[in-house]
C-alpha cells in the first residue's frame, strides 16, 4: 500500500467520523428545537426515553446512554466491528450534545420552534420527522445507526437475515410511536 492510498484511507475515515458526529449533533439539535419544546415523543428507544423524561424528569441524554451502552456492546460482539464503533460514536455524541443543549451550556433556545399555545401538533413533528429521517438515512449509508431500535433491528436481522432490515426498523419504531 502506498503512502497516497494510506493517506486517502485516513482522510476517508476522518470524513466518515466527522459526518457521524455532525449528524448526531444535528439530531440532538432537532430534539431541542422541535421535540422537547412541543412535548411529543419521536419513534424509537429515544421516544421511550422522551416519554420518561416528560413523566419522571430523567434526561433523554442519560437514558439514551443507559439503553445504548449495552446495545452497543452486543453490537460489537455479534455484528460488524466497524458498524459497532460508528454506532457507539453516534450514540455518545448524541447524548453529549443533548446534555450540552439541555443544560444550556450551549444555549440555542432562540432557535426553538413553539406556537402561541405552547405546542405544535403538526409542523414540529413533521419537521422533526423529516430531519431525523435524513439523519437515519445518512447514518445507515455510513454503515452506522442512531442506536436503540436500529441496533435491536440489526440484531434481529442477523438472526433472521431473510427479514428486510428497514421493515424491522419500521415495525419497531411504529410500535414505539403508537405507544406514545
Q: Where are each of the predicted segments found?
A:
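Core subunits and conserved enzymes of cellular information-processing
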Residues: 2-180
Amino acid at each position: 500500500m502506498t503512502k497516497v492510498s494510506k493517506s486517502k484511507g485516513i482522510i476517508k475515515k476522518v470524513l466518515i467520523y466527522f459526518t457521524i458526529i455532525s449528524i448526531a449533533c444535528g439530531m440532538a439539535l432537532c430534539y431541542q428545537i422541535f421535540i422537547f419544546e412541543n412535548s411529543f415523543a419521536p419513534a424509537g428507544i429515544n421516544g421511550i426515553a422522551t416519554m420518561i423524561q416528560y413523566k419522571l424528569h430523567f434526561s433523554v441524554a442519560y437514558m439514551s446512554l443507559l439503553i445504548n451502552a449495552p446495545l452497543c456492546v452486543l453490537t460489537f460482539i455479534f455484528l460488524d466491528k466497524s458498524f459497532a464503533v460508528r454506532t457507539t460514536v453516534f450514540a455518545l455524541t448524541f447524548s453529549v450534545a443533548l446534555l450540552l443543549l439541555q443544560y444550556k451550556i450551549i444555549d440555542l433556545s432562540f432557535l426553538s420552534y413553539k406556537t402561541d399555545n405552547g405546542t405544535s401538533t403538526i409542523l414540529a413533528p413533521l419537521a422533526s420527522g423529516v430531519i431525523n429521517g435524513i439523519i437515519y438515512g445518512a447514518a445507515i449509508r455510513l454503515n452506522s445507526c442512531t442506536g436503540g431500535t436500529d441496533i435491536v433491528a440489526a440484531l434481529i436481522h442477523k438472526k433472521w437475515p431473510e427479514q428486510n432490515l428497514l421493515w424491522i426498523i419500521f415495525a419497531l419504531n411504529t410500535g414505539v410511536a403508537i405507544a406514545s
